[in-house]
């Protein structure tokens, strides 16, 4: 359940989510949002792809980690799982690219999944990234 309230001086209402037991909680990964924007600005995007076919699998993640550090890896995920230590794959959620480019279908998948499970901060960030990408290509 969402509860919107306006904090004094806040530009928009703060959204609080009643936590459902057994459902992971996430915070927004700001460095990932910055990376996504840089990729869009650098025209490093794929506009048409089937996300189910191109999203990174566990072996893709392992290969990436063989030649990149955890900070770099983490910037491909919009969400940080609360209560899970850094530098573990379980910490990072809502992948939006293939470790090379951002995929429009990946952003849509993040938005959909976040909306479905009521992770409002992730949902809004994915929505804003999708709008940013669509404005850049218009």
List the model feature ranges, each with a label.
Residues 3, 8, 12-138:
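A charge-rich, low-complexity, intrinsically flexible signal that marks solvent-exposed coils, linkers
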């Amino acid at each position: 359940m969402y509860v919107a309230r306006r904090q004094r001086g806040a530009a928009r209402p703060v959204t609080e989510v009643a936590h459902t037991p057994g459902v992971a909680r996430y915070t927004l990964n700001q460095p990932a949002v910055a990376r996504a924007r840089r990729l869009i600005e650098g025209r490093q995007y794929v506009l048409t792809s089937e996300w189910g076919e191109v999203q990174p699998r566990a072996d893709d993640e392992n290969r990436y980690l063989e030649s990149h550090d955890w900070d770099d890896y983490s910037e491909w995920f919009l969400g940080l799982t609360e209560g899970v230590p850094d530098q573990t794959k379980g910490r990072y959620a809502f992948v939006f690219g293939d470790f090379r480019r951002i995929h429009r279908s990946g952003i849509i998948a993040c938005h959909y999944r976040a909306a479905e499970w009521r992770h409002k901060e992730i949902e809004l960030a994915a929505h804003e990234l999708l709008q940013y990408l669509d404005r850049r290509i218009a």
